[in-house]
Regions:
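Residues that define the transmembrane beta-barrel architecture of outer-membrane proteins
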Residues: 66-72, 108-112, 159-163, 209-215, ...
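Transmembrane beta-strands of outer-membrane beta-barrel pores
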Residues: 50-56, 82-84, 93-99, 134-140, ...
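Outer-membrane pore/translocation modules
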Residues: 106-214, 291
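Extracellular loop and loop/strand-boundary signature of outer-membrane beta-barrel proteins
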Residues: 58-64, 99-104, 149-155, 202-207, ...
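Residues on the lipid-exposed face of transmembrane beta-strands in outer-membrane beta-barrel proteins
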Residues: 46, 50-52, 72-80, 114-120, ...
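Sec-dependent signal peptide cleavage junction
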Residues: 16-47, 313-322
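Outer-membrane beta-barrel "beta-signal"
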Residues: 296-322
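Repeated loop/turn-to-beta-strand initiation elements of outer-membrane beta-barrel proteins
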Residues: 85-87, 125-128, 176-179, 228-231, ...
Length: 322
């Protein structure tokens, strides 16, 4: 069942991002030209958003709890092109808090991710590439009892820290879609704090360190599908060679649909799906933890708030490589 889920996800992703109607063939050729004609030098930019949500209730017969939440997101990039060489860098920051009724303020979102990839063009659409990626969070995360009191810390900065990298080939047919494939990929899970490691929540199997060697495929799609509506999707599939078929493939799939209202106001829908055989999720019954189980993880965020986009190009003239 899990294998079927992964296959269906890949097929649906490819269908959406790679299908080109007959009437769009001329546009696709223009996109390819834009990709190859990008000037040498740096291209810097990013987006920042701040989303605020508030629910107020007074004498509300249907019930519910008043709440306030705040979410900040920063996504920045720095790309450098020099002849056939392409170096891409990404920084992702996300932090959110919420306050429900009389409870103390709690964190409900936390992400710090750094990505760097180097590629050398071996043909018009293929790059020999290597990348490294680091993911962690910025502040401690706690579990709470029914009264809202902290019970135990389950994560903090660099606990866990997930570092993965690979050497492979990158297929880039146009400026919207890319597919990276590698039979030589590594994944390291670091949980330096013994008290957090022993909880076995982050895939390190109760240890401070775990190393995996396998294969990886990363599919990326980003495009303005209609005016002021942008879609971005990144699907990451990793297979540990030591795992048998029953353990299947690790899946990390992030999707964002953004709607730009004006220069400073925007709306967005974000979804994040994870399947990891080694991550055990606590199970509760009547507020009491009864054990752990492997579960499909899913998170979604819908928000309207302030947003700002910036971009800067620093062109550099270089002689063409033969």
């Amino acid at each position: 069942m899990k294998k079927l889920l992964s296959v269906l996800m890949v097929l649906s992703f490819l269908h959406v991002s790679a299908q080109v109607p007959a009437g769009e063939q001329a546009k696709t050729k223009d996109d390819e030209k834009k990709l190859t004609d990008n000037p040498n030098g740096w291209k810097l930019g990013g987006t920042g958003s701040l989303t605020f949500n508030q629910v107020g209730l007074k004498n509300w017969a249907a019930g519910g709890d008043p709440s306030i939440s705040l979410l900040g997101v920063i996504n920045a990039y720095a790309d450098y092109k020099f002849g056939k060489h392409l170096w891409q860098n990404r920084l992702g920051l996300e932090y959110g808090t919420q306050k429900i009724k009389d409870q103390a303020i709690r964190k409900n979102s936390d992400r710090l991710e750094i990505f760097s990839k180097y590629g050398y063009a071996v043909s018009k659409k293929w790059y020999a590439s290597a990348y490294i990626n680091m993911r962690t969070l910025m502040s401690p995360t706690f579990e709470y009892d029914d009264d809202g009191n902290k019970t135990q810390m389950i994560s903090k900065f660099a606990n866990p820290m997930i570092i993965d990298g690979a050497i492979g080939m990158d297929y880039v047919p146009n400026q919207y879609f890319s597919m990276f494939m590698s039979p030589v990929a590594t994944k390291m899970i670091i949980v330096a704090d013994d008290k957090i490691a022993i909880l076995d929540r982050h895939g390190a199997l109760g240890n401070n360190f775990r190393f995996e060697l396998g294969a990886v495929a990363i599919l990326s799609y980003k495009q303005e599908i209609v005016k002021n509506v942008n879609v971005q999707s990144v699907l990451r599939l990793f297979k540990d060679y030591k795992k048998g078929p029953a353990q299947n493939i690790d899946v990390d799939w992030q999707n964002t649909i953004g709607l730009k209202v004006n220069k400073f106001l925007s709306a967005a829908v974000f979804t994040h799906l994870i399947w990891d055989y080694d991550q055990l999720i606590p199970q509760f019954e009547n507020g009491i933890e009864t054990g752990v189980a492997r579960k499909l993880q899913f998170r979604n965020v819908i928000g309207v708030g302030l947003a700002y986009t910036m971009e800067k190009k620093i062109e550099k003239v270089v002689p063409e490589e033969k």
